[in-house]
Amino acid sequence: MADVVYPLASSTWGTEEIEAIQDVIASDMYTMGRRVKQFEQEYADHFDHGYAVMCNSGSSANLLMLSLLKLKYKLTGDIIVPAVGWSTSYFPVNQNGFKLNFVDVDPQTYNIDTTKIEQAITPNTCAIMAINLLGNPCDFDAIYKIADKHNIFVIEDNCESMGAKYNGRYTGGHGIIGTQSFFFSHHMQTMEGGMVTVDNQEDDDWLRSLRAHGWCRDLSPENPLFHKTGSWKDNFTFVTPGYTVRPLEMSGAVGSEQLKKWEEIMSARLKNKEHFFNKFGDEKYLKLQKTQGESTWFSFGCICTGALTGRRDELVTALTEAGIQSRPLASGNWLRQPVMNMLDYTATGDYSGADLIEDEGFFVGNGMQDVTKGIDAMYEVIQKLI
């Protein structure tokens, strides 16, 4: 196999992150503590969220989000979801007793097709999950027009779209709850880590209890769940059916260092994006992802068309042989995954957008590193194919 000349992801770490980890080790406090709390506040302030609760992954963030809907808001029924997304966007829906209600995606933006949401709504629909795919914001004007009409909640999986904006507002803050991931391939990397964002103290308290055993020791003094008496038993009082999805203290320390690099990270990503679109924006054999709002370009999504129609797998093989890494768009049409026979869901109507992404779609990487030479190499591979 050829050496990698264009990776899907690369590290955003430098000596600062290593030193931050060493400081935590020297403190002899490895579990969630002061550095996690510091990063939570810094993240909330930077991206204009009221409150931010860190956990051990974006997947766990989604689990906490759905648990909050069930336990605090007492919602039941089905939740509208797009047919293209990630596994742990969907699984927590069922794990919290909700039914998945699939709607097709727009093959240009890869996000939920807002023209098809209303026809999927049932008397039992309680929420719409907006997944901002590959850095691209959903059409929240259209989503909220429908949600307000039917009096249903909007929640937001923003794990791939940190820092994106729609109508001047950061994604992750358009729904009543938003989630974020800090996995290696994402905009900021704590390697493993996630965040849930909300805009009120009550939700914040619920999330902090759900995050750690269901106990009350992390709750604010005026929390709605338990009146602390000051007794030694307070720290061993359990008020929600919680999990154990706390982050490590090291992850919080690294997150603070990563946030300092945010402008540098985004500058590099946008430069890579300009080069990619200069190379492929006018070509007739690839349709590139269409943005709405301000995308933060998690990666570069492509759909084979023209001379490459039906040749996606051939192209992927050629790219791999040239050292250019690629992968499916998210997980393709989720309805075609074998795990569907274990899930509780509704799927009606047309899924041609998701099918096109499944059959003709792929993406290549973007990140803090300069990938322009890799983009040039990709262009040369394609020129030899067509």
Give names to the regions the model predicted:
Residues T190-G194, G255:
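Adenylate-forming
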Residues M29, R34-D78, P92-N94, F102-D104, ...:
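Phosphate-binding glycine-rich loop
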Residues E156-T190, D205, W232-T237:
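Conserved active-site segment immediately N-terminal to the catalytic lysine
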Residues F153-I155, I177, G361-F363:
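Structural preference for beta-strand elements that scaffold enzyme active sites
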Residues K70-K149, F153-N158, K165:
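PLP-dependent aminotransferase-like
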Residues M1-M29, R34, F236-V239, V364-G365:
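N-terminal "arm"/small-domain region of PLP-dependent enzymes with the aminotransferase-like
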Residues V36-Q41, H49-V53, S59, D104, ...:
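PLP-dependent aminotransferase class I/II
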